[in-house]
Amino acid sequence: MASYQSPYGIMKKNWIKRNLSWLWMVSLCLCIAVVAAGPAEAAAHQPSATPAVSSPDQTRKWHDDGLGISLWLPAGFSLTTPPRPEIHLAAVQPEGRLCIQISEEKQNQPVPPGRQKAYLKKSWQAYERILKKDPAIRDIHTGMTHIGTHQAASLTYTQRFYLGNQIIDLYTERYLLLSGSSLYILTLTADDSTKDLYLSSMRQCLQTFSTY
């Protein structure tokens, strides 16, 4: 019987560098783009595979039938074309520089249930070590929680960016969870100065994540 791949095996394949190290830049670019374009233009880039809704001010159900996943987006969010094939959902809200993303990494085989917690924790610990080397990143925290019915490893941090004369501090929450042979990364990004106004609804959104 083939053995499952260890968290350190994941590191050897550089999955962290491929699927995580660039996600902060994707978040920043999406947030900046939607601020510049405005909600109307962002809504115009909604993927055709996702059902249209009557108004961006209403909550809407997003789903990906290919992966068999869904969640309810908060009011005010507009869907935009994911910038990379690994990202299946990219939703933005211009006020507060908010972004919600879901990306997926296929595994060779499912991780046994009894080993999933250790697998997730060690995966985030490896990424945490990378983040700690960046002086622009602060307030790094990791832990375990649940997203819907799924056990998940959590990682939060704040990163500073300099855009000309403008300083932007982006707050990020990432959740790593397993479902079948897929590893999902759920990401929330918000302007650090106003994040408390939005985090509650964004976290509630992630709790609606489900598989079918």
Language model segments and positions:
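Soluble non-cytosolic domains of exported or imported proteins
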Residues: 68, 114-121, 192-196, 200
